[in-house]
Amino acid sequence: MPLINLPAFAGDLLADFERRNTLRVDTPVIQPAEPFLDMAGEDLRRRIFMTESETGESLCLRPEFTIPVCLRHIETATGTPQRYAYLGEVFRQRREGSSEFYQAGIEDLGDPDTAAADARVVGDAMFVLANRLPGERLKVTLGDQSVFEAVIAACGLPGGWQKRLIHAFGDQKQLERLLAALADPKSPGVFGHDVERVAALGMLEDEERLVAHIGETMKATGYSTNAGRSPRDIARRLKEKVELAAIRLDKEALGVMRAFLALDLPLADAPAALHRFAGKARLKIDDALALFDARVAALARAGADPGLMRYRAAFGRPLDYYTGLVFEIGVEGTPAVLAGGGRFDRLLTLLGAREHIPAVGFSLWLDRIEQAIAAGRAE
């Protein structure tokens, strides 16, 4: 189906992609919903347009391109390394603007030199934006999920709390709520009278008794176990929730995490600052810092202007599949995000790839770029 109402710069943008050694691909507008619901993150999940096939399969209008491009790569058994480019419509509910809009971008799959690939993708995004917005000063914000994960692991947090914090990475308010919860452990009573009662009866320490109690309660209230989670699933989730709520992180560890999340400085200064932080906090995060250092060095070798880039330790993006680098690009002095991306090394394996495929990429919001071009002309 031909694309209509494309921005005037679309042809030049595609030519830029071709010069960056990419293969242009398209994907169906109607997509299986499950991969997005499982892997895309809560922020995107609640904005997806859902539908259903005649056979009952959950489907959705394409809300983004990364997952469809990766699925296409797996289905066509294309070798790697491979760089894909795309331009097409995506569909998601937005607070501002149309729910149907154009995105374009590059997905860089299979390069084992992750630092070089990260630098290349950031450079690609800066290149195509600079060509659309000559004379405008860009600003680049970078974060690193792998460094964040290394810090919370080194602080000694239980796995359940690590998952919660990783899930909240990039959401400053949610991270603060979770840190506040870690500073103020709760008793089972905060979850209601019923949970307090089963705790008093010792059922939280006896999973079989708890499972039987939940099963009897479900049966008595007419709740079908086929309609949702099983009694055992509910019991395990309840135990985990109560156990996590009772955990307190000592003041020193909380101070370390807050000191890390407060780091916000020019990217060129970030490696030294992170090493100082790790040394002062006595955290063994050498592997994560080595990867971070390699990426900063690769960006310098690629000729990226360090004056445009800033590292924020608390910066993340609202998609669950990111594993390392995350970044956004806009115009200095304006709030609009024109490009965003990052590394997603686990995604292709989760989607069914038979081997590990490192991956990194970015997306462009063409409507926002069009508005930025118009604003520049009006000045």
From Swiss-Prot:
Primary site of residence: cytoplasm
InterPro entries in the cross-refs: aa-tRNA-synth_II/BPL/LPL, HisRS-like_core, HisRS/HisZ, HisZ
Compartment(s) of residence: Cytoplasm
Cellular component GO terms held in the UniProt record: cytoplasm
Pathway: Amino-acid biosynthesis; L-histidine biosynthesis; L-histidine from 5-phospho-alpha-D-ribose 1-diphosphate: step 1/9
Segments crossing the lipid bilayer: none
Name of one Pfam family that matches: tRNA-synt_His
GO biological process: one example: L-histidine biosynthetic process
SUPFAM superfamilies the UniProt entry points to: Class II aaRS and biotin synthetases
Alphabetic keyword roster: Amino-acid biosynthesis, Cytoplasm, Histidine biosynthesis
GO molecular function list: histidine-tRNA ligase activity
Main function: Required for the first step of histidine biosynthesis. May allow the feedback regulation of ATP phosphoribosyltransferase activity by histidine.
Family: Belongs to the class-II aminoacyl-tRNA synthetase family. HisZ subfamily.
Further remarks about this protein from its record: This function is generally fulfilled by the C-terminal part of HisG, which is missing in some bacteria such as this one.
Subunit structure: Heteromultimer composed of HisG and HisZ subunits.
Descriptive protein name: ATP phosphoribosyltransferase regulatory subunit
Organism whose genome encodes this protein: Rhizobium meliloti (strain 1021)
